[in-house]
Amino acid sequence: MPDLASLLTPNPYANDDGSMPQELRKAYESSSDQRVENIVRALDRVLLPVIPHAHPGTDANGKVLEHTSQPSHPLEREEGLVTAQVHNGRSAVVVFSHAEALTNWNATARPVPVSIEATAIATLKQKTGLIVLDPGTDNETVLGRTAVITLAAGGKWLAPWADPKIRGVITKLAEEYRDHVLSIELLPDVNGTAIVDMVFSRDSATETVVAVAQAVAATLETDPYVRARLDLVEIRPRPE
């Protein structure tokens, strides 16, 4: 039986034409150091893909075989939201900002407009914790668990690269390895990843670069606060 409460609740997206919201378009065009934060701030309505199940087939009499029907709304489906592999093979809930990006990703998928708050809550319940926005496009962005929690609860997101505690850890690492590395900084990448930018002198031995990069990665991995806040990170050693 249909959920009468949901049927009687006005649909806030009844007139949604599937185009990209203007505020999100502006966020996509932001400078790289502010882009991800502006995206999180701008997100409101997203499109969730609903991928149709294969036809169950028919019997000898042409009758459709028994099968379990699924709700039409993605938030009500038992199998959960559609996911894709992203950073380091991890799974992220797939969302889109506009219908064209969704159909280019999967021509059979049906777009359903949903609030980012409801999507974020469902993502956390699904124990995925990550959202990938507009996968397969130039705007593809992965939102880590801290961003998803903020979108679910409301409030302002503190990006890991802007977190004073994490920056303090990076500063200590730069001091600890100052004899081997010229600088260590935490920078945002345009795709949502936090980059640990490590600059070495050009005459640094490969063994030294690898050893220091591994030591820095181990420190970040074993620090409980950093590990909880810095869930999308990439170590990038490079010459000066």
Label the predicted regions:
Residues 1-240:
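An interfacial alpha-helical scaffold signature
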